[in-house]
Amino acid sequence: MGLVEFHSGAIDESIQHYQRAVSLEPRSYSGHYDLALAYLKAHKLEEARTQLELAVSLDPRRADAAYDLGVLLLEMGDPSAALIKLRQARALDPQRADVSFNIVRAQLESGRVNEARTEARESAKRFGSDFQWNAAVGQLFLEKGQAKDAVPYLLQASRVRPEDTEIRHQLALAYLESGQANEVLDTIPTAETSDDHYMRASAYYIAHRFPEADQESQLALAMAPENPAILILRTRLLQRAGEQDDALVMAQKAITLAPNWDEPYYLAGVSYYFIRRYEQAEASLARAVELNPKSARALFLESIALANLGKVEDAERCLRQAIRLQPGDARLHCHLGILLARKNESGAAEDSFRKAIQLKPDYGLAHYELGKLLVGSQQLRPAAQELELAVKDDPGLTAAYYQLARVYTKLGEKEKSQQALAEFERLYQQEAHDSRAVDQALDDDARRATELR
């Protein structure tokens, strides 16, 4: 009776019948298993878990109960426990593609990325011709931020069903997110839809083929003028072209269409920053961080905007938060050093500059800032060495030549001083105040950070 009511949609009544059945036969595998399915249908997950655990304990040779319990544990946020049950189900029935898929899923959700890669690779030997398995595993890797791992499975799915447009687009997206621009263009050789144009434009963008990216993105926007992703790409292209006002228009439209997406707020903050509207930049970037607290790039640029507003303590807080998120980013350590130097915390600033150089030995700005700091403490020879490295690593760092000329003068190396000053004047083509040159160097460094996608 419970089964009839279950299939007729009378879930509450079927639960009552199954409850009576298991009270009469408490050791009935099918009774507990069917009651679990009814609880699942009613979204009563804890009750379903209890019944599935009873079913598994009553008959550990049944793959269905072990599998369903594993999937339920995944849904309840316990991937490690789910993995045990899913492996149990596979041992009982190794031919099930759904079990293989969910093992990979459990491994990814528990942070065992290498195990997931191995599992998928081994399972492909058995399910490699299965379209659904390949498509599902590829999409799973893509959703979990492992685009490069998604490629072989989506590629195989596309080979099995070359006419499947959705899989072709998923494959193109995996190529795009793993930085394989040429493969995107090969996957979508001609554009018929706005998505096609967007994918091709994005591929040209990451390949630094900006004229083609501009053309394709305009075609995409003409076909889908209210697509936030296309608007964001147009914003980036306009920013690279220095058209910050037009970029802001695009970013603001994207904000209207996707108010809970951090990206348009971040890009609006970028444009506000480069047109020196620091208060608006800080507000927009703060909103981006609110929506995505793990956005180190938004925290970085927010810190620079705050510093320009004279809010050094708030700027330092943002930078330290960014460093906690990305401790291996040399730029963050360098700019923290700049802030600390402004606060006259020379020892801590020096530590930050040296950390930046350790992470990125050819980072010209870090060498420059360290050299300038050493000048202040009269360590002239080490300062000269750092400034020499600065101009070697970044020949366009004009302020470094100015500082180097001053240091050489103090060291009594007149010829070297004249050469450094001549190079400074050649780059500037006129006398320039050191602080203005430094501001330009910081702006250039910030711009490079915004261009890292």
Residue ranges and their predicted role:
Residues 11, 29-30, 63-64, 79, ...:
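Helix-start (N-cap) detector for alpha-helical repeat units in TPR-like alpha-solenoids
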Residues 7-20, 41-54, 75-88, 109-122, ...:
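Structural signature of tandem alpha-helical TPR/SEL1-like repeats
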